[in-house]
Amino acid sequence: MSIDIETTLQKAYPDFDVLLKSRPATHYKVYKIPKRTIGYRIIAQPTPRVKAIQRDIIEILKQHTHIHDAATAYVDGKNILDNAKIHQSSVYLLKLDLVNFFNKITPELLFKALARQKVDISDTNKNLLKQFCFWNRTKRKNGALVLSVGAPSSPFISNIVMSSFDEEISSFCKENKISYSRYADDLTFSTNERDVLGLAHQKVKTTLIRFFGTRIIINNNKIVYSSKAHNRHVTGVTLTNNNKLSLGRERKRYITSLVFKFKEGKLSNVDINHLRGLIGFAYNIEPAFIERLEKKYGESTIKSIKKYSEGG
């Protein structure tokens, strides 16, 4: 199956060829945001023009590529809650994290993934994908190209790259009565069988090497084995011992404190919008908690938070 991205974009953007020659892989604004624990995360955001073309490219790729069902991030109709639900009834849990995930994905990994899916792409279209969907950190003429955190095309491309990996890991897990899901760089495994999650851990190591060499690796500082005897969390959602999903005590306290500050008029615009997102997240996971907030602070307060976020 052959795809022609160039012709479609040339029709949509009269100045497309000029923009391509201007090395769009360097058209990024770079800034840092602090991580939850230590250090900073580098965000590289493309210019609005490049961003628009990235979105168009993804729409074209969606018509010709396959994303595995194990992928739950950046997939239409799936979210963090769906990812957690996969594991809510299991006793044993394993969580793995991939090091600097987006920044480890290169054009070559994408092209290999497309070839595995029998997608034929010309050198011209490969160059187009390199320039518009990858970030040249150094801005040098032959600088290394990687996916950036901040580009709208990065999530979908990462799912294409990981598709064959997800397929192999899913098959292994099915044979061993293990549930598997991947939310971007967060890999979660769960089971009711004793002593099998270590096998999954080893399988991930060997499968990463087979598909990516040493390019994409496990973060050994973030390996978590857990069970119902301990607190279990999957992509920010707490799994309770009675097979329910919960926000967890710490997050509930945090949201409650923000609602109190909102009512006192002590939150900035940015904080209010952040709170709005948390309220929506909480309602999807534990609606009874939102009902308790409404009783404590008034329904009008919670409605005001939602209304504010909508620009009202």
UniProtKB/Swiss-Prot annotation:
Record InterPro entries: DNA/RNA_pol_sf, GrpII_Intron_Splice-Mob/Def, Reverse_transcriptase_msDNA, RT_dom
Catalytic activity, reaction form: DNA(n) + a 2'-deoxyribonucleoside 5'-triphosphate = DNA(n+1) + diphosphate
EC top class, as a word: transferase
Keyword Protein biosynthesis on entry: no
Residues reported in the UniProt entry to bind Mg(2+): D97, D185, D186
GO MF assignments: metal ion binding; RNA binding; RNA-directed DNA polymerase activity
Annotated Pfam families: RVT_1 (PF00078)
Gene Ontology process terms (BP): defense response to virus
Residue ranges annotated for the Reverse transcriptase domain, each copy included: 14-239
UniProt keyword list: Antiviral defense, Magnesium, Metal-binding, Nucleotidyltransferase, RNA-binding, RNA-directed DNA polymerase, Transferase
E.C. number: 2.7.7.49
Role, per record: Reverse transcriptase (RT) component of antiviral defense system retron Ec83, composed of a non-coding RNA (ncRNA), this reverse transcriptase (RT), a probable ATPase and a putative HNH endonuclease. Expression of retron Ec83 confers protection against bacteriophages T2, T4 and T6. At multiplicity of infection (MOI) of 0.02 cultures slow growth when infected with T4 but do not collapse, at MOI 2 cultures enter growth stasis. Responsible for synthesis of msDNA-Ec83 (a linear ssDNA with a 5'-terminal phosphate residue).
Family according to the record: Belongs to the bacterial reverse transcriptase family.
Name of the protein described by the UniProt record: Retron Ec83 reverse transcriptase
Source organism of this protein record: Escherichia coli
